[in-house]
Every structure is written in C-alpha cells, then in structure tokens.
Design a protein with these regions (language model features):
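N-terminal secretory signal peptides that target proteins for export/translocation
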Residues: 1-11
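Sec-dependent signal peptide hydrophobic core
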Residues: 13-23
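Alpha-helix boundary/capping residues
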Residues: 21, 111-112, 188
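C-terminal motif of bacterial Sec signal peptides marking the signal peptidase cleavage site
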Residues: 27-30
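A short, solvent-exposed beta-edge/loop patch
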Residues: 39, 127-192
Length: 192
C-alpha cells in the first residue's frame, strides 16, 4: 500500500501565493465600476449652442409652470416641469434661459445657488426670486407616521449650467442632481 503524504507549501511558495492573491485583489478592486468625480456631469459646460425654450420643450421635458423672470436678473425664460426617460421615474427641473453662456454663468450662478443645495433659500420672505419657490421645496424626514415627514428641504441638491441654460435638477444629493442634469443635457444635445 502506498501512503500519501499531504503536500506542504514551503514558506517561499506560500509567500509568493499570498503576494499574488493580494495584487490580484487590488487590481480587481481598482478596476471596479464605481463612479468617480470624472464620471459626473460637469457643473458648468458650454457645448457651443445657444438654446431656446422651444428646444427645451421639444425634449421629453413637460412644462408645468412658466415663470415670470422679473426677479431673475438676465434670464429671458424660466420654466418648471419634469422629464421621464424611457418610462422611468419623472425628475423635476427648473430651467432658466439666458442670452449667452457667459450671462448664464455671471448672472445665473448666484440665483441658482439661492434655489438649490443645502443652503437654498426656501422662504418667500427671504428669497430674491420668489416665483415658483414652492416648486423648489420638498418634504423631508424619515420614519413612519404622519408627523415623521414634516420638514421642508430643497428639491434641487445642486444646479448645472449647460450653454446658456441654468438647470436646477431634482436630487437628494449633488451627485444625483448632476446625473439628472446630464440627462437633460443629453436630451438637448444627444451626442453629449
């Protein structure tokens, strides 16, 4: 009868095996599909096109309200609505149109900051652009029961400027908002 002795790894072979497994794990983790900041839609970009409200309305965007721009310096149009892509969830947007990309950046940025983000001004008494302020609010709060969801917070976590358009895009965080701004930009310029 032949006796079989178990194979024993020598220390150098075991060290080599552990090193190779560690390197493989690092390489696989490094090539993961997680999103990075490079994948985010840029907050300010200029495709070289001056868009009109009619071009926005020609996308899957559905207008719910058209706002007066009297309190919105430099804006020629302002609209609130939603867009649904491929039968998915609808996302709310506030779109503000300016004469140029530079006007959108110079005049639109302060007002976009006022209407979006964790420091958004959501009170008519304090806001500069009062038109549609209720559309920029959302009910927040966790838990169950009627009183658990009683806070008011910003519907738009951030904004993006795409050409001459300032977009406030629905999202609970800046990354989600920018992703949804990217959906609108892609609807305007499908090759973007």
């Amino acid at each position: 009868m032949i006796s079989k002795t178990p194979k024993v790894f020598s220390v150098p072979n075991l060290t080599l095996l552990i090193t190779l497994l560690t390197i493989s794990t690092i390489l696989i983790a490094g090539c993961g599909s997680g999103s990075s900041e490079d994948d985010l839609f840029p907050q300010i970009s200029d495709p070289g096109t001056v868009f009109t409200l009619d071009e926005v309305l020609a996308t899957p965007y559905k207008e719910l309200n058209n706002y007066s721009t009297d309190e919105l310096p430099g804006a020629t149009e302002a609209t609130y609505g939603f867009m649904r892509i491929g039968g998915g969830e609808p996302y709310d947007y506030e779109i503000r149109v300016y004469d140029s990309h530079q006007a959108a950046v110079d005049q639109g940025t302060p007002m976009a900051l006022e209407g979006s983000g964790e420091n958004a001004i959501l009170s008519e008494d304090d806001a500069t652009f009062k038109e549609g302020i209720k559309d920029r609010r959302t009910i927040i709060g966790g838990g169950t029961g009627g009183g658990a969801r009683s806070g008011i917070g910003p519907k738009f976590a951030t904004y993006a400027i795409f050409g001459n358009i300032v977009m406030l895009c629905q999202g609970s965080d800046a990354e989600t908002s920018l992703e949804r701004c990217g959906l609108m930009a892609n609807a305007l310029v499908p090759s973007e």
